[in-house]
Amino acid sequence: SLILLVAVQALTEEDLQLLRQTSAECKTESGASEAVIKKARKGDLEDDPKLKMQLLCIFKALEIVAESGEIEADTFKEKLTRVTNDDEESEKIVEKCTVTEDTPEDTAFEVTKCVLKDKPNFFGDLFV
């Protein structure tokens, strides 16, 4: 997809390796099933506690979510801009999608759902 192509071009090979490694480590930590992760890659997020843990783990590793569970808006925008190559678009997504839910896991899940509404292929196989 175009979005994934842009993501690959905007991120260095080192970035991609780190994301894949982080995703693998988080999968081990969260226990999320491969089936649920495959669906998530396609933009189909199941309301699954292990998937939520997976997303939170990745967001923490990318420093998008603080230890407190709150979204780090500046870091979130910076990471998005590296993928979108569009500062204005990233700003709009951050403003719209920076939410705080009852738990850090729910926050990561809802942020992901929000981003995927506008960009269904945004995360591709890089982030989950």
Curated annotation (Swiss-Prot):
Keywords: Disulfide bond, Glycoprotein, Secreted, Signal. InterPro entries: PBP/GOBP, PBP_GOBP_sf. The keyword Nucleus does not apply. GO terms for cellular component: extracellular space. Residues 1-10 form the signal peptide. Gene3D superfamilies: Pheromone/general odorant binding protein domain. GO terms for molecular function: odorant binding. It comes from the Eukaryota. N-glycosylated. Its main location: secreted. GO terms for biological process: sensory perception of smell. Tubular accessory sex gland. It is found in: Secreted. Disulfide bonds join 26-57, 97-114. May be a carrier protein for lipids. Belongs to the PBP/GOBP family. PANTHER family: GEO07291P1-RELATED (PTHR11857:SF43), ODORANT BINDING PROTEIN-RELATED (PTHR11857). This is B2 protein. It comes from Tenebrio molitor (Yellow mealworm beetle).
